[in-house]
Amino acid sequence: MNLIDQIESEQLKLDLPSFSSGDTIVVQVKVREGERERLQAFEGVVIAKKNRGIGSAFTVRKISHGEGIERVFQTHSKMIDSIEVKRHGKVRQAKLYYLRSLTGKKARIKEKLQLKK
C-alpha cells in the first residue's frame, strides 16, 4: 500500500451515516469562540455530494429568514461532530442545483418511504 493511501485511511471517519442528495440532514459543527468550543447545528437538504476518499465533500442548503444559505462540508473533517439524517428525499438527480432557483412549495422534496423488513 502506498504511504499516502495509508495516511489517508487512518484519517477517514468510519461512523458516518449513509445519505445522498435530497436527504434532509443535521450537521453538528464545532465552532470556536475565543477559548470556548461549542456545537452549532446546520440543518438543510443535501444538494450535492462528492466522493473522493479523504477529499469527500457535500453541500447542504437551507432557507434562513427568506435567504438561501449553502454550506460545503468536508466529510472527514474534524470540525464535524456528527451527522444525523432526518428524512430521505425522493430525487432522480445526483446534483440538485435547480433548487437554487425555486422558492416556496416548489422547492419541496417528496419523502422516500422505506419498506421495513
UniProtKB/Swiss-Prot annotation:
Coiled coil: none
GO cellular component: cytosolic large ribosomal subunit
Top-level taxon: Bacteria
PROSITE patterns: RIBOSOMAL_L19
InterPro entries linked: Ribosomal_bL19, Ribosomal_bL19_CS, Ribosomal_bL19_sf, Translation_prot_SH3-like_sf
Family stated for the protein in its record: Belongs to the bacterial ribosomal protein bL19 family.
Name of the protein: Large ribosomal subunit protein bL19
Organism of this sequence: Ruthia magnifica subsp. Calyptogena magnifica
Gene: rplS
